[in-house]
Amino acid sequence: MKFKKLLLILLLACPLVAEANPIITSWYTKQSGVYARVIQSSAITTPKTTWPDAGVTNNNTGGAAQTLPVYADVQRIRYTTTDVYINANGLASYTMGPWFTNSGGLFGFWPLSRDYQVRITRTPAPAATKTRHPGGMIGMMVNGVAIYDLGDAFSFHQTANSPSVTGTDGMGATGDGWWSRDALAVEVVTFDPGFAHQPGNNGQYHFHAEPKALRYQLGDNMKATYNASTNTNTYTEDITNLHHSPILGWAYDGYPIYGPYGYTAAMNAASGVSRMRTGFVLRNGQNGTQNLISTGRVTIPKWAAATFGISNPGNVNPVVLPSTQYGPTTTYRTTGPGGTTTYSLGRYCGDYDFLGDLGQTQGVGFDLDQYNGRTCVTPDFPLGTYAYFVSIDASGNTAFPHMLGKQYYGTPNAGNATTIPTNAIETFNGGPNTQETMLPLVTNPTTGNVAITWSSVEGDTYKVEASNNLQNWTTLNASVQGAANTTQTSITENGATIANPKRFYRATRTATATYDP
């Protein structure tokens, strides 16, 4: 790696100017030179840059672990006229973890660096025929963390339907399409305070719902309450100075994903800001829904039938299912190694109906369509765009379908990019490739001390020098480590202004620490 000297004076920078397009400029990069960190348990509360420690439960496939430090958030941004290309390791700069199970034990699945190189279209368009989300990644947060669908790949597998429905949930079971599980109903206990987790087979840290810690980092109407005993934050809504949510991520159809707050009137930026109300409600007998608590899971809502290809020749709502597709009653229970499971209302996607199919009007009784978005103006798109919004209820809790519905609004046109076009324009290259800059000096007029500060990369080594004439340089410190968990490093030269009528400083990166590329 070529190391560059940083001069406090005569520093002429000619940065590339990114095209004024939110899909290019909205990515979170200011902490790209910081290592990702994990808190491992309620007993091991010091954030670690490698994990898990020896002796800590590791249920990852093959015992896979993060054995080298890895840089957080988005690392590189490039674009062409048609696409944007994002490089990231898939790990956040806020402290991740810990993750627990229902019983309070360690989850045992650990996040791993993913080395993403993702392409997302810059020219999204509504799809005439909507596409159901696949398993795995369906978008990317602006910090480079994966977005998953609201489901968890499990559904109900019926073993009998007479005299009563019996069975259990399983991955890829035959209930897909009518009784597929809502991940939040089952997995939320395994989320960290940032509201994400990862599977053990690949360590892909991801979100199914609102990214609480990222929202806090971006200033999206959130506050953090620190718990000293666990060294973690609890994130809650803060509407004291309510403002329009920022872009939190991008779906793989190229449309933005905002936080939960938008303009009250979709096309009027002067209409005030409100929480965007989900269009989905539980099928509990209210709002014109069927009451599954009394009827059992013998019908499927119209939206789900259309989404999963279930025949509905009469275009009715709800759709009556054959007995072989009945789901469990809301009081049904099974007992297994993890204890007793109750199949309560809200466990499955089919437990929710869409208000638009119940005679209500979008923009009046609810704000978001069945894809969990709307066409609207936003601060980033003053002329209008289609946009998704994360959904929360009036108490600040996540609300179905949480982030995106079960289908893309637009045509999916994104994914892993094996190559980058040679004409792609680079607007950011951070992490270990950061081009450091000197920051203004801070002097103490009484002591003559000078604080020398520069932007730095965590783990790297710098030599700091001083000169009175820009020709002869004196080494002040030959080995300064880039400060931990921050993007700036400082040292002080004592009495500098008293001993020297004028003084110049420079810092040179002399070594890069070993890291996970």
Where are the predicted features?
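Sec-dependent signal peptide recognition
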Residues: 2-9
